[in-house]
């Protein structure tokens, strides 16, 4: 079973060209299924049936796994069985018809506009790490990049003269995004410093040894910036969520935000309308005289 799982992961990496981050998440989920099969003495993927998979989902849910995590696991299983069926190694899909237990819809965490400006407008020290990290933060917030898109960014994808960046998104789909003035300025300060490392390839963001920064290194630097400037936990996707929320709040153009984010399904983008409504409700509660009267206890 593990050999076939290895072959599937190689297929995802080489033929489907999924990002390392996505591949790691799929492998982690499928390893849970593999461990369950070994424990239940299920000796092949062909022998795993819908009842056994349903039992695993129930156990993981009882152990605290979120509905979203279980949905991703089922998606990984469906992908595996699609591959196994295509290769003639199986003739069924135990995940067919299964859905995870429903859970509360969690809204993405964002920074409000003031907090985003507080993060980005602080004084930047004149050194390698400070200029690099500032360029990373500005680009995340300016263009709404995914972590995998930023780590994979090469010099030939940047056009600072026209203020554009071309990124390779999920499913190897490319899209061209605007780069704001502040992000362009930060990149123009960073790129000459990058050359001092004699970089090994064309990566935009490199370490002091000239090697491309990986996802974990960028997560660590973003987290450090959040703790230093805001006193809170911060991760790259929070900057992407903030970009989306602030763009939608200003433009009210859901389709445009969908294109900028690279979402194939507008339903994925619609979650930001809930954030926008949440903001409007807060403004209403604080500003509308009738809302204030209700809060004051008048009837």
Swiss-Prot record:
The keyword Cell division applies. GO terms for molecular function: DNA binding; tyrosine-based site-specific recombinase activity. The active site is at residues 146, 170, 237, 240, 263, 272. Residues 1-85 form the Core-binding (CB) domain. It is found in: Cytoplasm. Pfam families: Phage_int_SAM_1, Phage_integrase. One of its GO terms (cellular component) is cytoplasm. Keywords: Cell cycle, Cell division, Chromosome partition, Cytoplasm, DNA integration, DNA recombination, DNA-binding. Residues 106-285 form the Tyr recombinase domain. GO terms for biological process: cell division; chromosome segregation; DNA transposition. InterPro entries: CB (IPR044068), DNA_brk_join_enz (IPR011010), Integrase-like_cat_sf (IPR013762), Integrase_catalytic (IPR002104), Integrase_recombinase_N (IPR010998), Integrase_SAM-like_N (IPR004107), Recomb_XerC (IPR011931), Tyrosine_recombinase_XerC/XerD (IPR023009). The keyword Cell division applies. Its main location: cytoplasm. Forms a cyclic heterotetrameric complex composed of two molecules of XerC and two molecules of XerD. Belongs to the 'phage' integrase family. XerC subfamily. This is Tyrosine recombinase XerC.
């Amino acid at each position: 079973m593990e050999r076939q799982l290895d072959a599937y992961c190689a297929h995802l990496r080489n033929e489907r060209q999924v990002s390392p981050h996505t591949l790691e998440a799929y492998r982690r989920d499928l390893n849970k299924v593999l461990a369950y099969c070994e424990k239940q003495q299920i000796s092949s993927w062909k022998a795993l049936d819908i009842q056994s998979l349903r039992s695993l989902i129930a156990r993981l849910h009882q152990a605290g796994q979120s509905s979203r995590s279980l949905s991703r696991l089922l998606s990984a299983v469906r992908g595996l069985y699609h591959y196994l069926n295509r290769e003639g190694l199986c003739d069924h899909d135990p995940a067919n018809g299964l859905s995870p237990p429903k859970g509360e819809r969690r809204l993405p965490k964002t920074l409000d506009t003031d907090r985003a400006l507080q993060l980005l407008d602080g004084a930047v020290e004149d050194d390698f790490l400070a200029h690099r990290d500032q360029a990373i933060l500005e680009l995340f917030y300016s263009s709404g990049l995914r972590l995998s898109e930023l780590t994979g960014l090469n010099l030939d994808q940047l056009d600072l003269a026209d203020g554009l960046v071309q990124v390779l998104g999920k499913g190897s789909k490319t899209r061209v995004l605007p780069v704001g003035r502040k992000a362009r300025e930060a990149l123009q300060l960073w790129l000459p410093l990058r050359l001092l490392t004699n970089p090994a390839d064309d990566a935009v963001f490199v370490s002091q040894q000239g090697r491309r920064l990986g996802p974990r290194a960028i997560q660590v630097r973003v987290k450090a910036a959040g703790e230093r400037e805001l006193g809170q936990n911060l991760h790259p996707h929070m900057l992407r969520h903030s970009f989306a929320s602030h763009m939608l709040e200003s433009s009210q153009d859901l389709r445009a935000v969908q294109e900028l984010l690279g979402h194939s399904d507008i339903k994925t983008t619609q979650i930001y309308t809930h954030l926008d409504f949440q903001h409007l409700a807060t403004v209403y509660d604080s500003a509308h005289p009738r809302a204030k009267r209700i809060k004051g206890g008048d009837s």
